[in-house]
Amino acid sequence: MLRLLEEKIATPLGPLWVVCDEQFRLRAIEWEQYRDRMEQLLNIHYRHEGYERVSATNPGGLSDKLADYFAGNLAVIDTLETATGGTPFQREVWQALRAIPCGQVMHYGQLAAQLGRPGAARAVGAANGANPISIVVPCHRVIGRNGTLTGYAGGVQRKEWLLRHEGYLLL
């Protein structure tokens, strides 16, 4: 049975749930107000193998590392390991998201083209929306083709804050 360690941490944007496995690979990061979404994704991805969730304090130093990110050490999120469920296509999109440099953005069509699927912008958007590891798998760095801030499960205000925090200048 998969054992998931979880902790709720304080951030400038509100409480954030951090969930990892016993090897301290992130399995989920989600804002408190969207905890139901996180629980649905955990069930979708891990119910077949069975899992239990256990309260933990700073598992693997992950909570401290996320606090460091919010304090300005932006590069720390690139060092964090993830282990996600999802379809092969979703995992491919999530891996591509991690390659978008801090302070930069892409639109869904650019990301689809980068994956060799230029007609799959909507599918990329759907995979982006199913991302279980907010911030570390930086789905907030994907914007609409016309530059609008669209499609962040944590809310557009948080997306804007994260992009500004990372140095992306919004007009």
Swiss-Prot record:
GO terms of biological process kind: DNA alkylation repair; methylation
Q: Which PROSITE patterns match?
A: MGMT
Stretches of the chain forming a coiled coil according to its record? none
Q: Which Gene3D superfamilies match?
A: Winged helix-like DNA-binding domain superfamily/Winged helix DNA-binding domain
Residue positions of the active site: 139 (nucleophile)
Name where it's found: Cytoplasm
Catalysed conversion reaction: a 6-O-methyl-2'-deoxyguanosine in DNA + L-cysteinyl-[protein] = S-methyl-L-cysteinyl-[protein] + a 2'-deoxyguanosine in DNA; a 4-O-methyl-thymidine in DNA + L-cysteinyl-[protein] = a thymidine in DNA + S-methyl-L-cysteinyl-[protein]
Q: What is the name attached to this protein's record?
A: Methylated-DNA--protein-cysteine methyltransferase
What is the top-level taxon of the source organism? Answer: Bacteria
Its biological purpose: Involved in the cellular defense against the biological effects of O6-methylguanine (O6-MeG) and O4-methylthymine (O4-MeT) in DNA. Repairs the methylated nucleobase in DNA by stoichiometrically transferring the methyl group to a cysteine residue in the enzyme. This is a suicide reaction: the enzyme is irreversibly inactivated.
Mind telling me which PANTHER family this protein's record contains?
A: METHYLATED-DNA--PROTEIN-CYSTEINE METHYLTRANSFERASE (PTHR10815:SF5)
Stated EC number for the protein is: 2.1.1.63
